[in-house]
Regions:
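Acidic, low-complexity central loop/insert segments
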Residues: 1-40
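Acidic-enriched, low-complexity/disordered segments with a strong bias for Aspartate over Glutamate
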Residues: 2, 8, 28-29, 45-47, ...
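Short, charged, solvent-exposed linker or helix-capping segments at domain edges/interfaces
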Residues: 14-15, 46, 138-139
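Short helix-capping and hinge/turn segments at secondary-structure transitions, especially at repeat
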Residues: 18-22, 40, 44, 73-83
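Short, conserved active-site entrance elements at the starts or edges of catalytic domains
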Residues: 33-57
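Glycine-rich, small/acidic residue-mixed loop/short-helix segments
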Residues: 50, 55-72, 76-160
Length: 160
């Protein structure tokens, strides 16, 4: 949780939380938790070229019952077709893998990493993969090493 408090009360709140066993988290810790939770972040895992469904945001970001909105035609087309060509997945990645690292299979580029974090569970990343590779346990090349799909996050064009 995020707590917002007046500056003059921040130290008292920190001390009270510490007495209850809470520990402060830094930005790297928060990033690791986000990546482990499979939550896409705009500017890292999403940009205007991505469909909300590709990033696993169908239920959180789209109302299929509302009237007109920017991008409605593209979202509707993907929904009617019933499938997407690429989508967000969570992967275990090798040391040295970073955001922007291409993901490959059979010598072909099939995706790229968008966020990478060191976590208690290892080096974990979010990235986009082509549809044929949306399988937990799927192995793809990641730079000089290999990445393994841990979780498929993409929602395949399903109405919310």
């Amino acid at each position: 949780i995020d707590l917002l408090v007046a500056a003059d009360g921040a130290e008292a709140l920190r001390a009270a939380a510490a007495r209850q066993g809470a520990t402060p988290l830094g930005q790297d810790d928060l990033e690791a938790l986000r990546v482990l939770a499979g939550i896409a972040r705009f500017g890292a895992d999403m940009d205007p070229s991505r469909l909300p469904m590709e990033a696993g945001l169908t239920r959180a970001a789209i109302s299929f019952g509302k009237g007109c909105y920017t991008g409605q035609e593209v979202v509707l087309r993907a929904t009617v077709r019933g499938h997407l060509q690429r989508g967000l997945v969570q992967l275990e990645v090798p040391p040295g893998a970073a955001a922007g690292t291409p993901l490959t299979a059979n010598g072909q580029e099939v995706g790229a990493l968008t966020s990478v974090a060191d976590t208690p569970e290892g080096r974990i990343a979010l990235g986009y993969l082509r549809r044929a590779h949306w399988k937990e346990g799927e192995r793809v090349g990641a730079g000089a090493g290999e990445a393994v799909v841990r979780k498929v996050i993409v929602e395949d064009g399903l109405p919310g």
